């Protein structure tokens, strides 16, 4: 099996996520796997170790910046609203979106990569034309996009480089 250059956040921090999920006593918003407080702890770390199954676990700090920004992101997502991270290159937008997705949905890889060539089909769904011809329009012939998968499963969809997409794509999402 090939090893990934950079494993997904949910693989890289699997143990921390498991500890937080299983020790979390807070209320989880719908489709969240842990409470907003546990999501904050996952990203900003814990000052005290967490006891789980007879062991002590220290949740490491993953984001070094403005803690209030993390809290605003979590509150926005808990309010069932979209979140757009905007900033200069290298300001940890992708890293933060991966951490939030892994903590909230358990998956950080449900992603659309925006380019100048991104079309509406790429953000909704497309068709497996061989199956479409053989069986007609059916769920089996449909190839869902990450956005479709996110809506179907109730998980976050990350949209990288949305500003590179054509204006009509941006307008349809915003």
Where are the regions that the model predicts?
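AAA+ P-loop NTPase catalytic core and its hallmark functional loops
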Residues: 2-174
């Amino acid at each position: 099996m090939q090893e990934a250059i950079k494993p997904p956040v949910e693989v890289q921090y699997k143990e921390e996520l498991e500890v937080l999920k299983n020790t979390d006593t807070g209320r989880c918003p719908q489709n969240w796997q842990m409470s907003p407080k546990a999501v904050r702890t996952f990203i900003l770390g814990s000052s005290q170790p967490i006891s789980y199954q007879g062991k002590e676990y220290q949740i490491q700090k993953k984001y070094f910046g403005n803690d209030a920004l993390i809290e605003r992101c979590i509150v926005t997502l808990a309010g069932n609203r979209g979140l757009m991270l905007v900033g200069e290159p290298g300001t940890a937008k992708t890293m933060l979106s991966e951490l939030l997705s892994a903590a909230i949905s358990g998956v950080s890889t449900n992603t659309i990569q925006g380019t100048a060539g991104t079309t509406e089909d790429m953000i909704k769904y497309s068709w497996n034309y061989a199956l479409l011809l053989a069986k007609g329009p059916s769920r089996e012939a449909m190839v869902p996009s990450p956005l479709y998968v996110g809506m179907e499963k109730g998980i976050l969809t990350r949209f990288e480089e949305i500003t590179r997409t054509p204006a009509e794509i941006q307008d349809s999402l915003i």
